[in-house]
Regions:
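Arg/Lys-rich, positively charged N-terminal/basic patches that mediate binding to nucleic acids
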Residues: 1-34
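Short amphipathic alpha-helical/adjacent loop interface patches that line ligand
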Residues: 14, 18, 34, 38-41, ...
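Short proline/glycine- and basic residue-enriched helix-capping loop/turn segments at helix->loop/beta transitions
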Residues: 42-46
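Basic/aromatic recognition patch in beta-strand/loop cores that engages polyanionic ligands
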Residues: 49-79
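Enriched for short, Lys/Arg-rich terminal
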Residues: 69-70, 74-96
């Protein structure tokens, strides 16, 4: 069974997203948004989502958009390694 793992950078991204969402909207909205991101990671692991090739940004990477954010990940055997979770307006290439 495939599983997903958040890199330390992706975990920090998720915490930043939660914190920003609480400050900007509410803790309830932050929980819903972070849950949507985690659900997308589950979908990647289950095969319900495959994402798109992100080789134009970094070789071997794939991406999946969730709300205003983009999950960057690599598939390695039975593991989906979520590398970063970045806002779509960021300079993505420089942060990977």
């Amino acid at each position: 069974m495939t599983r997903y793992v958040l890199s330390p950078a992706a975990q920090a991204d998720l915490e930043d997203i939660w914190r920003y969402s609480v400050e900007r909207w509410s803790s309830a909205q932050a929980e819903r948004y972070v849950l949507a991101i985690r659900d997308a990671c589950d979908d990647l692991a289950s095969g319900a989502q495959a994402g798109q090739d992100a080789g134009d940004i970094r070789d071997g990477y794939r991406k999946l958009r969730v709300g205003s954010h983009v999950l960057f990940f690599r598939r390695s055997g039975a593991v989906i390694d979520v590398v970063r979770i970045l806002h779509q307006r960021m300079d993505l290439a420089s942060r990977l």
